[in-house]
Amino acid sequence: MSVRVWCLGDAVVDLLPEMPGRLMQCPGGAPANVAVGIARLQGNSAFIGRVGDDPFGEFMRQTLIEEKVDTRYMIADTQHRTSTVVVGLDDHGERSFTFMVRPS
């Protein structure tokens, strides 16, 4: 019998500084990250949550699929956009976070 671990919550796209004036998009959100971690450990995981029906939402869906996470209950919301977080780094390596408002 195969046990599936269901991860419920947010999936966000983190925007990290790659070089001056350029941000790199990375998958984020603790529940989505946990689902990926379980799958990488050969576990059977699934993600339940909502993203926007937009390019960031499609990026999150494709990333989870590529990581072998079941996304059948991941909803693409046409009324709200995918959550995004801009991550900043100060001179000491401390992170700051700017969360976009009204996400999915």
List each model region and its residues.
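Positively charged, low-complexity intrinsically disordered leader regions
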Residues: 1-22
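Residue-level recognition of conserved structural "scaffold" positions that shape functional pockets
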Residues: 16, 35-36, 59, 100
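Short glycine-enriched, charge-decorated loop/helix-capping segments at active-site entrances
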Residues: 20-26, 102
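Hydrophobic/small residue at the entry helix of a nucleotide-binding pocket
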Residues: 30
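Alpha-helix C-terminal capping segments
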Residues: 33-44, 89
